[in-house]
């Protein structure tokens, strides 16, 4: 299934107190990490991200995990399905926050590897969902084999730069011209 990438509590369901303590601990670690980076770069580092997936999303949703100011919160799809989990809709967005997405076109563990299968409509669905949510500050895509995924890579780039231009059928026609 999901390989080794899983929440810290997958095999042992924690209490709310444990979740709260975990969130506070991780929040302090994020702040310390940002402070170290800023010190090491004489304050020149200007872009910070944190990718939420499973436990990160759950801790943010409950208000236990807080990020330092200026950190872009990045939401990841569940790689095998290439869809966002239920937590995607439940995590609150702050008015002045920065948000983005991490999306898989390819996944070694159990998704497409040599043959693309995401399809333009699924890609459109996910990109439109992110765009409509306001998660537009950061886009990153995971694809391990570029050669087999050029068609989808171009579609992803086009939709990230101009969602209004990206219509699956129109893209297909332009690509084939």
Language-model-derived ranges and their functions:
Residues 75-81, 87-177:
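Structured mid-domain segments that build the active-site/substrate or prosthetic-cofactor binding neighborhood
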Residues 1-95, 177:
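Gly/Pro-rich turn-and-neighbor structural signature
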């Amino acid at each position: 299934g999901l390989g080794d990438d899983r929440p810290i509590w997958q095999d042992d369901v924690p209490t709310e107190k444990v979740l709260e303590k975990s969130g506070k601990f991780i929040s302090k670690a994020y702040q310390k990490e940002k402070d170290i980076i800023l010190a090491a770069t004489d304050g020149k580092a200007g872009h910070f991200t944190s990718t939420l997936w499973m436990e990160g999303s759950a801790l943010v949703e409950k208000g236990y995990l807080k990020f330092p100011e200026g950190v872009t919160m990045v939401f990841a799809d569940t790689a095998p399905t290439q869809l966002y989990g239920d937590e995607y809709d439940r995590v609150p967005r702050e008015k002045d926050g920065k948000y983005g997405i991490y999306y898989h076109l390819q996944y070694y563990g159990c998704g497409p590897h040599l043959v693309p299968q995401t399809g333009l409509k699924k890609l459109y669905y996910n990109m439109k969902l992110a765009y409509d949510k306001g998660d537009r500050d950061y886009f990153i895509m995971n694809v391990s084999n570029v050669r087999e995924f050029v068609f989808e890579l171009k579609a992803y780039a086009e939709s990230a730069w101009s969602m209004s231009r990206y219509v699956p059928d129109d893209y297909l026609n332009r690509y084939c011209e």
